Amino acid sequence: MRAKPFDLVIAMPGGDISETFDGAALIKAEFPAVPFVVLTPFSKEVSRRIEKQDMSCIDYVFSWLGNMDLLLAIIKLLEDKLNENDISDVGIRMIMLVEDSVRFYSSILPHLYKFLLKQSRLFSTEALNQHEQMLRMRGRPKVMLARNYEEA
Protein backbone atom coordinates (compact mmCIF):
# COMPACT_ATOMS: atom_id res chain seq x y z
CA MET A 1 0.00 0.00 0.00
CA ARG A 2 3.00 2.28 0.32
CA ALA A 3 3.95 1.85 -3.34
CA LYS A 4 0.42 2.32 -4.68
CA PRO A 5 -2.21 4.18 -2.63
CA PHE A 6 -5.66 2.65 -2.20
CA ASP A 7 -8.92 4.41 -1.40
CA LEU A 8 -10.66 1.36 0.07
CA VAL A 9 -9.81 -2.11 1.36
CA ILE A 10 -12.41 -4.86 1.14
CA ALA A 11 -11.50 -8.19 2.71
CA MET A 12 -13.28 -11.54 2.65
CA PRO A 13 -12.15 -13.71 5.54
CA GLY A 14 -11.16 -17.29 4.89
CA GLY A 15 -11.08 -20.04 7.49
CA ASP A 16 -9.34 -17.96 10.15
CA ILE A 17 -11.30 -14.76 10.72
CA SER A 18 -8.70 -13.43 13.16
CA GLU A 19 -6.20 -13.05 10.28
CA THR A 20 -8.56 -10.57 8.60
CA PHE A 21 -8.94 -8.53 11.78
CA ASP A 22 -5.19 -8.63 12.49
CA GLY A 23 -4.55 -7.43 8.93
CA ALA A 24 -7.11 -4.66 9.38
CA ALA A 25 -5.36 -3.53 12.57
CA LEU A 26 -2.00 -3.36 10.75
CA ILE A 27 -3.47 -1.41 7.84
CA LYS A 28 -5.39 1.00 10.08
CA ALA A 29 -2.28 1.62 12.20
CA GLU A 30 -0.35 2.81 9.16
CA PHE A 31 -3.19 4.17 7.01
CA PRO A 32 -5.97 5.35 9.36
CA ALA A 33 -7.85 7.28 6.64
CA VAL A 34 -8.32 4.23 4.39
CA PRO A 35 -11.72 2.59 5.02
CA PHE A 36 -11.61 -1.13 5.78
CA VAL A 37 -14.69 -3.21 4.96
CA VAL A 38 -15.21 -6.90 5.69
CA LEU A 39 -17.45 -8.99 3.43
CA THR A 40 -18.51 -12.27 5.02
CA PRO A 41 -20.63 -15.14 3.84
CA PHE A 42 -23.68 -15.27 6.07
CA SER A 43 -23.70 -18.05 8.63
CA LYS A 44 -24.34 -18.23 12.34
CA GLU A 45 -20.82 -19.52 12.97
CA VAL A 46 -19.22 -16.56 11.16
CA SER A 47 -21.51 -14.15 13.02
CA ARG A 48 -20.49 -15.63 16.37
CA ARG A 49 -16.78 -15.44 15.52
CA ILE A 50 -17.08 -11.82 14.35
CA GLU A 51 -18.80 -10.82 17.61
CA LYS A 52 -15.70 -11.96 19.50
CA GLN A 53 -13.33 -9.79 17.43
CA ASP A 54 -12.12 -6.25 18.10
CA MET A 55 -14.13 -4.16 15.63
CA SER A 56 -12.33 -0.86 16.25
CA CYS A 57 -10.23 -1.16 13.07
CA ILE A 58 -13.16 -2.18 10.84
CA ASP A 59 -15.35 0.51 9.31
CA TYR A 60 -18.16 -1.79 8.19
CA VAL A 61 -19.03 -5.48 8.06
CA PHE A 62 -21.35 -6.65 5.30
CA SER A 63 -22.88 -10.01 4.59
CA TRP A 64 -22.14 -11.18 1.06
CA LEU A 65 -25.39 -12.52 -0.35
CA GLY A 66 -24.23 -12.66 -3.97
CA ASN A 67 -25.75 -9.29 -4.92
CA MET A 68 -23.22 -7.31 -6.99
CA ASP A 69 -25.12 -4.10 -6.19
CA LEU A 70 -23.77 -4.41 -2.65
CA LEU A 71 -20.35 -3.24 -3.89
CA LEU A 72 -21.87 -0.05 -5.32
CA ALA A 73 -23.82 0.45 -2.07
CA ILE A 74 -20.60 0.10 -0.03
CA ILE A 75 -18.84 2.71 -2.15
CA LYS A 76 -21.81 5.10 -2.03
CA LEU A 77 -22.14 4.64 1.75
CA LEU A 78 -18.45 5.49 2.23
CA GLU A 79 -18.78 8.51 -0.09
CA ASP A 80 -21.78 9.69 1.93
CA LYS A 81 -19.82 9.24 5.16
CA LEU A 82 -16.91 11.28 3.76
CA ASN A 83 -19.32 14.02 2.63
CA GLU A 84 -21.19 14.05 5.94
CA ASN A 85 -20.48 17.77 6.43
CA ASP A 86 -22.71 18.56 3.40
CA ILE A 87 -25.71 17.65 5.54
CA SER A 88 -25.20 20.44 8.05
CA ASP A 89 -23.21 22.92 5.92
CA VAL A 90 -25.19 22.86 2.67
CA GLY A 91 -28.49 21.39 3.82
CA ILE A 92 -28.40 18.13 1.88
CA ARG A 93 -31.12 15.75 3.06
CA MET A 94 -30.17 12.61 4.95
CA ILE A 95 -31.65 9.17 5.42
CA MET A 96 -30.53 7.61 8.70
CA LEU A 97 -30.70 3.82 8.69
CA VAL A 98 -30.42 2.44 12.22
CA GLU A 99 -29.98 -1.32 12.05
CA ASP A 100 -27.83 -3.80 13.93
CA SER A 101 -28.46 -6.83 11.72
CA VAL A 102 -25.56 -7.17 9.27
CA ARG A 103 -27.63 -9.43 7.07
CA PHE A 104 -30.55 -6.98 6.90
CA TYR A 105 -28.58 -3.81 6.12
CA SER A 106 -26.48 -5.77 3.61
CA SER A 107 -29.65 -6.64 1.72
CA ILE A 108 -31.54 -3.33 2.10
CA LEU A 109 -28.74 -0.84 1.25
CA PRO A 110 -28.37 -1.93 -2.41
CA HIS A 111 -32.13 -1.52 -2.91
CA LEU A 112 -32.15 1.84 -1.13
CA TYR A 113 -29.29 3.25 -3.23
CA LYS A 114 -30.78 1.88 -6.45
CA PHE A 115 -34.07 3.64 -5.62
CA LEU A 116 -32.33 6.92 -4.69
CA LEU A 117 -30.20 6.94 -7.85
CA LYS A 118 -33.25 6.21 -10.00
CA GLN A 119 -35.19 9.05 -8.35
CA SER A 120 -32.23 11.42 -8.75
CA ARG A 121 -31.97 10.55 -12.43
CA LEU A 122 -35.68 11.24 -12.93
CA PHE A 123 -35.45 14.48 -10.97
CA SER A 124 -32.42 15.65 -12.95
CA THR A 125 -34.31 15.41 -16.26
CA GLU A 126 -36.42 18.36 -15.11
CA ALA A 127 -33.34 20.59 -15.07
CA LEU A 128 -32.87 23.24 -17.72
CA ASN A 129 -29.21 22.60 -18.58
CA GLN A 130 -26.46 19.99 -18.05
CA HIS A 131 -24.89 21.81 -15.11
CA GLU A 132 -28.19 21.91 -13.28
CA GLN A 133 -28.74 18.22 -14.10
CA MET A 134 -25.40 17.31 -12.49
CA LEU A 135 -26.18 19.37 -9.41
CA ARG A 136 -29.51 17.62 -9.00
CA MET A 137 -27.93 14.18 -9.45
CA ARG A 138 -25.28 14.94 -6.81
CA GLY A 139 -27.85 16.50 -4.50
CA ARG A 140 -29.49 13.17 -3.71
CA PRO A 141 -30.13 12.45 -0.04
CA LYS A 142 -27.11 11.05 1.79
CA VAL A 143 -27.48 7.71 3.55
CA MET A 144 -25.94 7.25 6.98
CA LEU A 145 -25.77 3.84 8.60
CA ALA A 146 -25.81 3.55 12.39
CA ARG A 147 -25.63 0.17 14.04
CA ASN A 148 -27.25 1.32 17.30
CA TYR A 149 -29.17 4.29 18.70
CA GLU A 150 -26.10 5.77 20.39
CA GLU A 151 -24.23 5.84 17.10
CA ALA A 152 -27.24 7.44 15.40
Short names for language-model regions:
Residues 1-3, 53-60, 64-150:
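Non-catalytic signal-transmission and effector/linker regions of two-component phosphorelay proteins
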Residues 1-36, 40-51, 58, 70, ...:
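Conserved phosphotransfer microenvironments
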